[in-house]
Amino acid sequence: MITGCAENAGTSGDKESGMYTMHGLTTQEFVTEMGAGINLGNTFESCGAWIDSESVTNFETGWGSPVVTKELIQGYKNEGFGALRVPVAWSNMMLENYQIHPDYLARVKVVVEWALEADLAVILNIHWDSGWWENFPTDKENCMEKYTSIWTQLCDAFGEYGDKLMFESLNEEAGWSSIWDRYSGTEEQKAESYALVNEINQTFVDLVRASGGNNAERHLLIAGYITDVALTCDPLYKMPEDPAGKCAVSVHYYTPATYCILKQDADWGKAKKAWGSPRDYGELETNMDLLYDTFVSKGVPVIIGEFGVETANKEADNVKLFLSAVFTEARERDMCPVLWDITNVFYDRTTFQMVEEYSDLNEMLTAPVE
């Protein structure tokens, strides 16, 4: 049972409400309408053996998030965001035979409903989930059984919701260094790793479409190769065949990594404290052009499912410069950028508005792009 949250009771809603509506948009129209999105990060995807698995709340708050409330979700909409990505570790509290715990499923369902009621598009995925993805190369049969079991249950649980709910095949785990190392692997190894990624994504599409109902026409988000821009734009990466023709591709954008990820110097790079040189802008434009030319120009919409910055040791104005630049370059090419956010970095989950230091960030990220 979930504790500490009185707003968990029930997931039944008015069947006439917009959350059950199929709008009939193309996936590109849907992605364009999203505008800018934000992640409900470090919440339902939290995991770890040290977390008491007796209640969903222990996982929901295990990585620092407060218990999610309807007001918290409505706050995203009030701040101008058009989409909410909900990362989930479905293995938490999982029962035998890969059965999702009913309490965990019910709690995520409540939050998804709150988002749909707020007129947010919702992206629902399987996240890192304690890393069981790493076993695909050596235990493909069991991993695929778990993968299909999870999505079969999710298709059933969320199948009645309208097409503002999007399913995402997986997070950024599609790619295995145990098969192919991008720096030293062979072409044969590379082909093998890409083939496995393509197989998982095709399995996902086939399963969702076969479940029928609204899932037959639901917009689907297909994970790129480790969601890396260059590797996803490689000819070996294939979008799955989809009878509905409603798939978009997902990449993540943390480039340059020395700026976006590092707090301090590491053995692989020196921490970059400022962004904005002509070279920085050129790199961003080159990557966005590559995505546009490879996918958007050929009718495949692009969602940048995560982009963000490690804010430690950086000036807020410079962080905003980078984030707004990514947003602008993405939106100018009809792509939807989804900000990676965890508790109280950019959005305050207790006051339901942007934190003071980034109080104008939402305006930058949701401003119209000419």
Walk through the language-model features, giving the residues of each.
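Active-site region of glycoside hydrolase catalytic domains
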Residues: 144-280, 289-310, 332-335
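An active-site-proximal structural segment forming one wall of the substrate-binding cleft
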Residues: 20, 63-84, 94, 98-128, ...
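C-terminal motif of bacterial Sec signal peptides marking the signal peptidase cleavage site
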Residues: 2-6
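Aromatic-rich peripheral "rim/lid" segments of glycoside hydrolase catalytic domains that contact
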Residues: 314-370
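N-terminal carbohydrate-binding accessory modules
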Residues: 9-83
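Surface-exposed, active-site-proximal loop segments in enzymatic domains
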Residues: 50-58, 90-106, 128-145, 175-189, ...
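Acidic/histidine-rich helix-loop elements
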Residues: 41-68, 96-100, 139, 258-284
